[in-house]
């Protein structure tokens, strides 16, 4: 079942944030420290922000199996960009012990439906090129590159 995250979910969300960070740290230790993206206190603030919904997949015991952090974005009165509403996926993770059960696909589908229900034009996300499994997952969901970030390490 997919539902909105609640304060009681923060400990498990924190564990999953650490799993994501470890993948990023292993792929790009020059950029990512070992840790997690948000503290428990920051998560409490995010949970109250209607512009930053967090969807969670839970099992029959209401235990979190995965999450999808979202952010509503909209450029208004921009000289170049059109005024469209976007749902940006800031982070999507399924517990590494539960992968392969289509939980990620269910979370992504719920995010798409949530975006539609909220009048969004599109859904976007960023994925690090070192995270090949995530890239394959998003491609299997039908996402295509919108823009490409490039770098040269000096």
List each model region and its residues:
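A short beta-loop-alpha structural element at the N-terminal edge
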Residues: 1-15
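Conserved active-site alpha-helix within GNAT-family acetyltransferase domains
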Residues: 105, 109, 117, 129-147
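Conserved beta-strand-loop-alpha-helix junction that forms the acyl-donor binding cleft
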Residues: 124-134, 151-154
